[in-house]
């Protein structure tokens, strides 16, 4: 079976590095990705995709990327089932990043 995803878009907020109780670095961020099509007379729509990165990838993202940065993410899709505080069953979908890279100019990325 294959579970591979690649997205490219802009970060919607600054990533914030966290550390698990066992000392593993993790960062969660969201990427706005424009859809490939646009209906006549309408604005282009975007999808907002949640991404999680671990260890060195998390540290790299938190150090070099900010809100508005263009980013390319390679990884896999992961789903989680959970019950919210009101007792409703929910499902979340996210990309778990295995690789990230710059997509904008040096001036745009701030490096």
Identify what each model region corresponds to:
Residues 1-111:
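Single-stranded nucleic acid-binding surfaces, predominantly the OB-fold ssDNA-binding core
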């Amino acid at each position: 079976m294959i579970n591979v995803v690649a997205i490219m878009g802009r970060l919607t907020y600054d990533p914030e590095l966290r550390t698990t109780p066992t000392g593993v670095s993790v960062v969660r961020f969201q990427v706005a990705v424009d859809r490939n099509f646009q209906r006549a007379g309408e604005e282009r729509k975007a999808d907002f995709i949640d991404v999680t990165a671990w260890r060195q990838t998390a540290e790299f993202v938190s150090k070099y990327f900010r809100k508005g940065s263009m980013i390319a993410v390679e990884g896999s899709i992961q789903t989680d089932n959970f019950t919210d505080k009101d007792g409703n069953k929910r499902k979340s979908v996210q990309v778990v990043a295995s690789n990230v890279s710059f997509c904008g100019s040096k001036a745009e990325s701030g490096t």
